[in-house]
Design a protein with these regions (language model features):
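TPR-repeat structural position
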Residues: 17, 58, 65, 113-114, ...
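Short, intrinsically disordered, charge-balanced linker/junction segments flanking boundaries
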Residues: 1-2, 194-204
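Generic signature of mature, soluble extracytoplasmic domains
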Residues: 128-129, 155-163, 167, 171-177
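Amphipathic alpha-helical repeat scaffolds of TPR domains
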Residues: 6-9, 35-54, 83-111, 117-122, ...
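Start-of-domain marker
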Residues: 3-64
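Single-residue signature of alpha-solenoid repeat helices
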Residues: 20, 68, 116, 166, ...
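Short solvent-exposed coil/turn linkers within tandem alpha-helical repeat scaffolds
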Residues: 27-35, 72-95, 126-144, 172-184
Length: 204
């Protein structure tokens, strides 16, 4: 078993992600090590990498990416210089955003609608976090309202029979006056919903 963080880094470099996770979890179970900023960054990298491993059960992927996000945030709290994140230009966050977005679609296609909704919501949360920090990436530009992501979350919420959440997401689109053929169903859905509730004010 790895005894120090350099050993764990070596395991990670060899793509031994399962073993690396066991090792980093054991390493960080010691209170002193749990205050090591490098350990939190490494945990984030390990957990996110393991989430892409073909042998990882799909049911574990969401939690691994969720915990990776929390680990990167903890790293930044402990390292005022933000060295590792600056070296990678904060791309771990972008990777988590894209990974959770894709996971939401994957769960949706598998008819796991609750899991799909959770993944889309987490992707949106990470996107909002990235924008709040003003991180920018050469390969993609993120926007405050990711219309496709919000629509996907709304549709997943409908399928999961979580209508209150679906309405919240649909309203994000209509409140922003999003238009086009792809979004006609949004206005039709809300009109039908509020008509059934006799809520004329919300129809305006």
């Amino acid at each position: 078993m790895a005894q120090d963080i350099d050993d764990i880094k070596d395991m990670m470099a060899k793509s031994q992600f399962k073993e690396s996770k066991v090792a980093i979890d054991k390493y960080m179970s010691t209170p002193k090590n749990a205050e090591n900023s490098d350990a939190w960054y490494l945990k984030g990298r390990i957990y996110n990498s393991l989430s892409y491993d073909n042998t990882t059960p799909e049911s574990d992927v969401y939690n691994l990416r969720n915990e990776a996000f929390a680990a990167f945030q903890k790293y930044q709290q402990l390292d005022p210089k933000d060295l590792w994140m600056k070296l990678e230009n904060f791309e771990s966050y972008l990777n988590l955003y894209g990974g959770l977005y894709d996971l939401g679609a994957k769960f949706y296609n598998a008819k796991s609608y609750d899991a799909s909704l959770n993944a889309f919501k987490k992707a949106n949360e990470i996107k909002d976090f990235i924008l709040s920090k003003k991180y920018e990436f050469n390969q993609v530009k993120l926007y405050p309202l990711d219309t496709a992501l919000v629509l996907n979350a709304a549709v997943a919420a409908v399928q999961a029979k979580k209508m209150d959440e679906a309405i919240i997401f649909y309203r994000k689109l209509t409140d922003a006056n999003v238009g086009g053929k792809d979004y006609e169903e949004v206005y039709e859905f809300l009109a039908d919903h509020y008509s059934k509730k006799n809520d004329e004010a919300s129809l305006m």
